[in-house]
UniProtKB/Swiss-Prot annotation:
Protein name per Swiss-Prot or TrEMBL: DNA ligase
The keyword Zinc belongs to this UniProt entry's keyword annotation: yes
Gene label: ligA
Cofactor(s), by name: Mg(2+); Mn(2+)
Record's function text: DNA ligase that catalyzes the formation of phosphodiester linkages between 5'-phosphoryl and 3'-hydroxyl groups in double-stranded DNA using NAD as a coenzyme and as the energy source for the reaction. It is essential for DNA replication and repair of damaged DNA.
Family matches, as Gene3D superfamilies: 5' to 3' exonuclease, C-terminal subdomain, 6.20.10.30, BRCT domain, DNA ligase/mRNA capping enzyme, Helix hairpin bin, Nucleic acid-binding proteins
Highest taxon, organism lineage: Bacteria
Length: 652
């Protein structure tokens, strides 16, 4: 019986791959169903022999209560975007300055959802969403229902891989036909449908919707030398990889590839929104490293956005958490990139003046980055005697006089007690990338603020269940959940708190770098501008902004209040002792290492307290140079930086 079960699992997985991945089935649906029913029956009789890669694991039936947060072992970075050939040429120049012979891998940018898959001993252990790059959601049960994701690898590997989960166009059309027949609201586009499906709590619905994946990265350390090798290895493990790709050292040839794909993309069975260009050599990738936000060795070219004409009916002016006043146009509704658009940003007053935008104008609307609707320009041939737009002199929230600082493009309200600014700051503090207080969205903030229950972020921690129950629409169950979410947020690692404070220029990635360095929010608040500016990837602008923020008396009072409510100020991620051998030193790895991998060398340096960066500068303390070291070694010699070899590192 056990042999027959093994045989059936092998056959059914092969037939499923032919059907879902290769679009080339070799057996009929009825033949597949017959074998599948046989396996189900055998598994009922012999549950002790059920294999981890059995296709029966993909069948629905589970109704999940929710999704738990998942800390990624290997962070998922965003990519720098490019919208023109000139930006790609500039990227090429930056790379070639370090590596004149660098070749690139150009791959399709699938319009889906990034997922991370972790296998332990070859068995799928965790499938998670990207989230903010550091913390995603555990959606393992849903990803088990995606038919081209292997539940079990042929080898007993411990590996984490990355890819894009998407909905093929054919599956998208079938879902919307069914929704139409049932009188339900249709999905706007395949990406929204894929996102909605992966958020389903009923795994049976996920199993029916025929999601698919393309894998593109091994996040865990690999012995492979190039991105091309990685893709071939992923395919050998049974993952789906995309074969529309090109390797070339010529950006002109990459551009020709982009133009060809853009012209033909409508014929692809899935949506794409651009081309990702990566340095093909993994060793070069390591040397180039990362900025605070993105890898220096990759760029995402985005196809030109779809454009439509619409009429501006009116303009709303709103003030954000930093006091910037943003104009938003109300439009005649148009269909754009799969959604109905009736509002679009006008950016700022300088943009309105530059484009001479007026109410009543017919304008060209597009989605910036395929996400945010924006006005591109005015169709002057359709203008009729519209008057120049009146720019507000007073804040739309508090009535204070607005200012337009020299060198800035935006109007700004500088009243610290402006109600809308306060509400926006409170909502930001509770948002997912900050303190992540579930249920504490803008509408709740509005109710609490209007009821005079909160006026600053410390007030959030004064709230009781009884306070929440005084609000319209809040029942005991909701109030209890929100209260517990507030209490749980006290235990967040301090970089979440720092980002939540909404300091100008200090994003989530910079917050993490700062807390990794200083370990504690109080220590950071007392740090000098020079010590902050010396952190690789940050600089003087962030240092000055932090110094200005922390020297305010009201900020010191706020930190005291947060301390009294037991809000955690410590960084909970991995840090190295200040007594470590290389503590505080900035080190660059360059050249080919013979006795250890680059990842092993990097990990050893970090464990010894060093900060490993990708570029040589005056801030670099030493470099470890292997064979064939290039421009980085030359630059280090010119700057008089200490140079060590691989043996020196091995002997530490």
């Amino acid at each position: 019986m056990e042999n027959r079960m093994n045989e059936l699992v092998s056959l059914l997985n092969q037939y499923a791959k032919e059907y879902y991945t290769q679009d080339n089935p070799t057996v009929s649906d009825s033949q597949y169903d017959q074998l599948y029913r046989e396996l189900v029956e055998l598994e009922k009789q012999h549950p002790e022999n059920i294999l981890p890669n059995s296709p029966t694991h993909r069948v629905g039936g589970l109704v999940l209560e929710g999704f738990e947060k998942y800390q990624h072992e290997y962070p998922l970075y965003s990519l720098q975007d490019a919208f023109s050939k000139e930006e790609l040429i500039a990227f090429d120049k930056r790379v070639k300055a370090e590596f004149p012979t660098a070749a690139y891998m150009a791959e399709l940018k699938i319009d889906g959802l990034s997922v991370s898959l972790t296998y332990v001993n070859g068995v799928l252990q965790v499938g998670a969403t990207r989230g903010d790059g550091n913390i995603g959601e555990n959606i393992t049960e849903n990803l088990k229902r995606v038919h081209d994701i292997p539940l079990h690898l042929d080898q007993s590997l411990d590996i984490t891989v990355r890819g894009e989960c998407y909905l093929p166009k054919e599956s998208f059309e079938a879902i919307n036909i069914e929704k139409r027949a049932n009188g339900e609201q249709e999905f706007a586009n395949p990406r929204n449908a894929a996102a909605g499906t992966l958020r389903q709590l009923n795994t049976g619905i996920v199993a029916k919707r025929k999601l698919a994946t393309f894998l593109y990265q091994e996040a865990s350390p690999t012995q492979k030398e190039t991105q091309d090798d990685v893709l071939k290895e992923l395919e050998s493990y049974g993952f789906s990889v995309n074969h529309h790709r090109l390797i070339s050292s010529s950006m002109e040839k990459i551009w020709d590839f982009i133009q060809t794909i853009e012209k033909d993309r409508v014929s692809l069975p899935y949506d794409i929104d651009g081309i990702v260009i990566k340095v093909n050599s993994l060793a070069m990738q390591e040397e180039l490293g990362f900025t605070v936000k993105a890898p220096r060795w990759a760029i995402a070219y985005k196809f030109p956005a779809e454009e439509k004409e619409a009429e501006i009916l009116s303009v709303d002016w709103t003030v954000g958490r930093t006091g910037v006043v943003t104009p938003t146009a109300n439009l005649t509704p148009v269909q754009l990139a799969g959604t109905t658009v009736s509002r679009a940003t006008l950016h700022n007053v300088d943009y309105i003046a530059e484009k001479d935008i007026r109410i009543g104008d017919t304008v060209v609307v597009y989605k910036a980055g395929d996400i945010i609707p924006a006005v591109l320009n005015v169709v002057m041939s359709k203008r009729n005697q519209q008057e120049v737009m009146l720019i507000p002199k007073l804040c739309p929230s508090c009535g204070s006089e607005l200012v337009h600082f020299e060198g800035e493009v935006a109007l700004r309200c500088i009243n610290p007690l402006c109600p809308n600014q306060i509400k926006e700051r409170l909502a930001h503090f509770a948002s997912r990338d900050a303190m992540n207080i579930t249920g504490f969205g803008p509408s709740l903030v509005e109710k609490l603020f209007d009821a005079h229950l909160i006026a600053d972020v410390a007030d959030i921690y004064r709230l009781s269940i009884e306070n929440l129950l005084t609000l319209d629409g809040i029942k005991e169950k909701s109030a209890t959940k929100i209260y517990h979410a507030i209490q749980s947020s006290k235990e967040n690692s301090a970089e979440k708190l720092l980002f939540g404070l909404g300091i100008r220029h200090v994003g989530s990635k910079a917050s993490r770098l700062l807390l990794e360095e200083f370990g504690n929010l109080r220590q950071l608040s007392q740090a000098s501008q020079e010590s902050i500016a010396s952190i690789d990837g940050l600089g003087g602008v962030i240092a000055k902004s932090l110094h200005t923020f922390f020297e305010k008396e009201e900020v010191d009072k706020l930190l005291e209040e947060l301390t009294s409510y037991n809000v955690n100020f410590n960084y909970l991620g991995k840090r190295v002792s200040t007594d470590a051998q290389l503590s505080g030193l900035t080190v660059v790895l360059t050249g080919k290492l013979e006795k250890m991998t680059r990842n092993e060398a990097k990990e050893k340096l970090q464990n010894l307290g060093a900060k490993v960066t990708g570029s040589v500068s005056k801030k670099t303390d030493l470099i470890v140079a292997g064979s064939d070291a290039g421009s980085k070694l030359t630059k280090a010699q010119d700057l008089g930086i200490t140079i060590q070899d691989e043996d020196w590192l091995l002997n530490l």
